[in-house]
Amino acid sequence: MKALLLGAPGAGKGTQAQFITAAFGIPQISTGDMLRAAIKAGTPLGLEAKKIIDEGGLVRDDIIIGMVKERIAQDDCKNGFLFDGFPRTLAQAEAMVEAGVDLDAVVEIDVPDSVIVDRMSGRRVHLASGRTYHVTYNPPKVEGKDDVTGEDLIQRDDDKEETVKKRLAVYHEQTEVLVDFYSKLEGEHAPKYIKVDGTQPVEAVKAEVLGALGK
């Protein structure tokens, strides 16, 4: 099973990724992990990427695609892989097809923006322990205070409504192009496109995703 998982920040993609990788015995591949591994291993592509990152630049697509090809040639990918957050752009998706990296399925966890804003902007965190609360779904016993220590809870910058809305706008801009690209592919290159309602309970989303993937 060679699949790509799409979902906005806060859509519950990470949870579903764990279910998919466990069900099919395949690794989850993210560009961040791949870059770190290549840099640590000191591969030629890793060294080139490190130089660009150290200079504050963005790693070029040709380096990323090269790393992807190296990564999916490894033994643990013989039954397939799950791409998470890659490809991000139309150029990357096109380069993947040109490089002969085909996908069996593209899975999108679909959650309305209003639900995601509510999920993320309601998060509160106790920094010292990492304990996380939600003002609606998992509130602390005392508003704004950690249950264990009584210390203040904070709202991370990433979870502020304006930030969440900006991230969603970027996600839609990128993803709509990808969805359009994959849905128009024909013949052997065409993956199955699966859109799942991510507002359902976690187990229901899991059942629908795995069912659509043939498990």
UniProtKB/Swiss-Prot annotation:
Pathway(s): Purine metabolism; AMP biosynthesis via salvage pathway; AMP from ADP: step 1/1
One Gene Ontology cellular component: cytoplasm
Ranges for region NMP: 30-59
Cystine residue pairs: none
Result of changing residue 201 to A: In strain: HF4, HF8, HF16, HF79, HF85, HF110, HF113, HF116, HF147, HF175 and HF200
UniProt binding sites for AMP: 31, 36, 57-59, 85-88, 92, 156, 167
Gene Ontology BP, a term: AMP salvage
Cellular localisation: Cytoplasm
A GO molecular function held by the record: ATP binding
Region (LID): 122-159
Protein name: Adenylate kinase
Family note: Belongs to the adenylate kinase family.
Keywords: ATP-binding, Cytoplasm, Kinase, Nucleotide biosynthesis, Nucleotide-binding, Transferase
Subunit-level organization: Monomer.
Task performed by this protein: Catalyzes the reversible transfer of the terminal phosphate group between ATP and AMP. Plays an important role in cellular energy homeostasis and in adenine nucleotide metabolism.
A Pfam cross-reference name: ADK
Source organism: Neisseria meningitidis
Top EC group: transferase
Listed Gene3D superfamilies: P-loop containing nucleotide triphosphate hydrolases
NCBIfam families: adk, PRK00279.1-1, PRK00279.1-2, PRK00279.1-3
Entry's free-text remark on domains: Consists of three domains, a large central CORE domain and two small peripheral domains, NMPbind and LID, which undergo movements during catalysis. The LID domain closes over the site of phosphoryl transfer upon ATP binding. Assembling and dissambling the active center during each catalytic cycle provides an effective means to prevent ATP hydrolysis.
E.C. number(s) listed in UniProt: 2.7.4.3
Keyword Kinase: yes
